[in-house]
Amino acid sequence: MAKKVAVFWPGDYRSKPNEWATPQAREATAQLMAALIRLGRTPYQVEGFLTKPDQAIARLGPIDDPMVGVFVHWAYAPHTVDGVVGKDNPLLLASNFSGTWPGLVALLNTGASLESVGRHASRAWTDAPDWTKDAAFMERLDEWCSTGQIVHDASELHQPGPVGAAAQAIADGVAEAIRRRRVLALMLGDTSMGMINGYFGPRLLYPIGFAEHKVDQAWLVDRERSIAPSRVEAAFAFVQEKGVTFHWGEPDAEDFTPEATKAQLRMYLAVLDLLDEFQADCLGWQYQLGLLNLLPPSDFCEGLLNSHARPEGNGHVVITSTEADQGNLVPMELMKRVLEAKGLPGAVMFHDVRWGAMHEGRWLWVLLNSGSCGAYAFNDDLDRLDGVHSYRQPSGYFPVPGGTFAGVSRPGPITWARTWVDRSGGLVMDLGRGESVALPDDVREAWWRGTTRQWPFMAADLGCSPETIMAHYMSNHVAVAYGDLFDEMVALSAKLGIRVRVLSAT
């Protein structure tokens, strides 16, 4: 591999997050450059954060040297992908491993986005204060410098085995129902923040029994104005009576008031009307960045839609995928249908793979996303919203006040899934078994405050090593359901023509 190595900073479009992350980026870059020099390379830095696709095209496109992207916070995938797609120079994605500064989340999203467009990239990560002192990181970096790629252990990636007759029968029934009536996804916008890996489109959705109907988010600005005040007041009374705890007017959230919650409920009702108008089965909702300065955050609305107890509801959830992510929408809708076919509540949670650590000899991931986690994760009473807490979304990211749909996830066995696009253009369903784990209060609070305290929390064993997730997982998002529906999902995915990949230590 060539001696010269270009080091660049993938960035957020928003200036504030980049400003906050600059000290971390500088420190990590200094350590990375020291490591590269130690390995006999000559690193140089591409100027500044890449905050728009055109900057990636202009600054990365002309570079033929090997390249390293340094991820220390959330970054948009096109700020890397658009500058390197179609090229074959060695590319390494290198991230920190921090809950507070989620570079690993951006690495997972960018790696999956690169895979979906057929661009090879290697991955390396470290939680060490000094990257040069992490032996495992240095070993991976040395391998990349020597060969242009890193080959990670793949022993926990498997083909699925045979499934039992009962699971096959349920899968066959769900597949037949989809054959009779195609799943219609209402898409409010296309992806969010450049999540290339989260958009499939009709060419990939039609063959697996899905269709999408796109509605511009601008409709919401108009539609929510015509919602009758009486409906908003009834919805407001409903969520209070059902047990939601609202954290209005707390420090750093003085502008989060009952009126802000009512504005969110008005938006929820407008979306409910759109779902009814188009008779859609499920929903993908972009929100960011288009509505950021116009309407309150969508998170409380999404949490309600993913709950059985909701205003003007029918006793069932409406599967809702935040950030219009079809890679989670597909498995969430399929898991809901399998659960209901098994006579179980059709609740499926949407989360980010945010951070992880050892606890009592066991690796646990903190799964944490501001939207799309329903109340069933926090209590097992389908008629209640107890355990739901609504905090103001952090104002540094969300200027219009509005609340989240947070809580502590119950312990229990889980099945998890994710659909992604491989470099040949085909769909793959990742599946695994795991467990939602109850942590001691002090540990949970420390982990929660080390990430984002306002968002719903799950500590989960995903049934495979952290190295397998970091090296091979093709998203920062994951769909989680309580119970064991692994075999049914294997059979259903195969029936619909989706290739299955199992992630498991056994």
Segments predicted by a language model, with ranges:
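Metallocofactor- and cofactor-centric catalytic cores in central/energy metabolism, strongly enriched
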Residues: 1-119, 124-139, 154-186, 191-282, ...
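Active-site proximal loops enriched in glycine and acidic residues that flank catalytic Cys/His/Asp
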Residues: 9, 286-287, 350-354
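Anion-binding alpha/beta catalytic cores of soluble intermediary-metabolism enzymes, centered on
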Residues: 101, 105, 112-115, 124-142, ...
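Intrinsic low-complexity, intrinsically disordered or marginally ordered coil/linker segments
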Residues: 143-156
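Residue-level signal for secondary-structure boundary elements
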Residues: 149, 342, 500-504
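Long, internal scaffold/assembly segments composed of regular secondary structure
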Residues: 231-341
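C-terminal catalytic subdomain
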Residues: 309-444
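Extended hydrophobic packing segments that form well-structured cores
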Residues: 389-506
